[in-house]
Amino acid sequence: MAKSVPAIFLDRDGTINVDHGYVHEIDNFEFIDGVIDAMRELKKMGFALVVVTNQSGIARGKFTEAQFETLTEWMDWSLADRDVDLDGIYYCPHHPQGSVEEFRQVCDCRKPHPGMFLSARDYLHIDMAASYMVGDKLEDMQAAAAASVGTKVLVRTGKPITPEAENAADWVLNSLADLPQAIKKQQKPA
């Protein structure tokens, strides 16, 4: 049996990149300051990096799945060029009220459901209790809780923080950029 590894689960829009709303083109994709360095440091610390992102714009007809895949490939290569290798990218193209029939459905992968997390856990042998979820919305925290992710981290770089999201989170940080230091501080012996 493969040894399980801890992971950092990462929402995309508002966590890795600035959320300009239905981001689907390279020209509109802007990495948030400090996140690439943080991701590199988290890899050095022994974490797998796994993106888990709702992409309802596909179901809503705002952009195609092919456009999303092109942008995702570009993001993955951009990170790899900066010595950040993602271990997995999981996305949900569905929405119950989508205008594109193929993707109009209730599914178990759309956050707050844990489907993407559980798929990653099984495929990558992730130790969920030792893992972290980083996101900017309540649904990110709820999905992480449903998947038994050990630490739920809410960041201020995306949507405005709601009291519900703050209550569902274990930690609230200004940015993903602050996570490596926060983990190191927590792991220091008292």
Swiss-Prot record:
Gene3D superfamilies: HAD superfamily/HAD-like (3.40.50.1000). The record marks 110 as: Contributes to substrate recognition. The active site is at 11 (nucleophile), 13 (proton donor). It catalyses: D-glycero-beta-D-manno-heptose 1,7-bisphosphate + H2O = D-glycero-beta-D-manno-heptose 1-phosphate + phosphate. InterPro entries: HAD-like_sf, HAD-SF_hydro_IIIA, HAD_sf, Heptose_bisP_phosphatase, Histidinol-phos. The record marks 53, 111 as: Stabilizes the phosphoryl group. It comes from the Bacteria. Pathway: Nucleotide-sugar biosynthesis; ADP-L-glycero-beta-D-manno-heptose biosynthesis; ADP-L-glycero-beta-D-manno-heptose from D-glycero-beta-D-manno-heptose 7-phosphate: step 2/4; Bacterial outer membrane biogenesis; LPS core biosynthesis. The keyword Metal-binding applies. It is an enzyme of class 3 (hydrolase). Keywords: Carbohydrate metabolism, Cytoplasm, Hydrolase, Lipopolysaccharide biosynthesis, Magnesium, Metal-binding, Zinc. Substrate binds at residues 11-13, 19-22, 53-56, 110-111, 137. GO terms for biological process: ADP-L-glycero-beta-D-manno-heptose biosynthetic process; lipopolysaccharide core region biosynthetic process. Its EC number is 3.1.3.82. Its cofactor is Mg(2+); Zn(2+). One of its GO terms (molecular function) is D-glycero-beta-D-manno-heptose 1,7-bisphosphate 7-phosphatase activity. It is found in: Cytoplasm. Zn(2+) binds at residues 92, 94, 107, 109. Mg(2+) binds at residues 11, 13, 136-137. The keyword 4Fe-4S does not apply. One of its GO terms (cellular component) is cytoplasm. Pfam families: Hydrolase_like. Monomer. Belongs to the GmhB family. This is D-glycero-beta-D-manno-heptose-1,7-bisphosphate 7-phosphatase. It comes from Escherichia coli O6:H1 (strain CFT073 / ATCC 700928 / UPEC).
